[in-house]
Amino acid sequence: MELNIIEIKDFDAKELDIYARLSEGQLLNRAEPEKGIFIAESPKVIERALDAGYEPISCLIEKKHIDGEGKAVLEKCDRIYQNTKRYSDAEKQENLVLKNSKENTVSEEKYALKNIKYKETDMSDFPVYTAEFDILTKLTGFKLTRGILCAMHRRPLPALEEICKDAKRIAVLENVMNPTNVGAIFRSAAALNMDAVILTNGSSNPLYRRAARVSMGTVFQIPWTFIDISGNGETYIGRLHRLGFKTAAMALDDNSVSIDNESVMSEEKLAIILGTEGDGLLKSTISESDYTIKIPMSHGVDSLNVAAASAVVFWELGNK
């Protein structure tokens, strides 16, 4: 089937709003996750999102990449898009048959699905918008990494209890607002065998374009969810304790112990809590945690960037 290549001629086309005029916050639409959209950037990130089950809506690609680096991922997007559409059509047909059937038997359901007819065409209806590099840069406001973007449907996030059910080692990001740091932490967490990442609601969303790109798509490979720290009722530290986790706050404190502390590393279920750039963790988080830990440093250096610090502590955990 031939790809549905659409050359961009009108910057104001409604279909391009998701790439040109909507903020990432508007795309994500946290209040209604079933309607939310995110933008994946680069072939590697898009492919990992597709492999994780996210459904594509459309692609925006630089012309020279259509038959080059972007070809395989465009074809994969198209296949998934068509399969999703057919599955949706089958569900609609099934519901219609069940509604109109007097007996609603299992055999009727199977017959209805088996006999759905699809219109075969030579042209895909998965939209692939394209233009030269300068036009795409002007449209989006930034230079596309590896020349391709893909708009995708987001999914409702799992509950904290589901994420933590079988986890032994998790990372908690408290108000980490920089998407580059969030992406780098996810990449380290995936590479160094952490089981999940939990984010407080003041943190950058891992599905932001830059966060997902910096993570190299690992935001689609490691389980994650948001946790509320509004202070209404039980604290998030309390929830983690209730789920069987000991908590270790990364902070410079008179009571801090080294990350290789035997008691810390021997905990069966451990949550490493990392704080926002600059201010670090909330005092209440530190006081409620079971441990306060630090990375031993030299030459008068007292701290590392949160993404760098996370890689060190994840590696240390992996060696125990």
Tell me the role of every PLM-derived stretch.
Residues 1-67:
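Boundary-proximal intrinsically disordered activation/regulatory segments immediately upstream
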Residues 6, 79-82, 100, 123, ...:
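RNA substrate-binding interface of SAM-dependent RNA methyltransferases
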Residues 44-46, 65-66, 134-135, 203-204, ...:
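Alpha-helix capping/helix-boundary segments
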Residues 71-124:
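Intrinsically disordered, low-complexity terminal tails and inter-domain linkers enriched
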Residues 125-132:
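A glycine-rich helix N-cap at a beta->alpha junction
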Residues 147-150, 188-192, 206-219, 283-320:
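Structured adenosyl-cofactor binding patch, chiefly the S-adenosyl-L-methionine
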Residues 248-301:
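Active-site/ligand-binding-proximal alpha/beta "capping" segment
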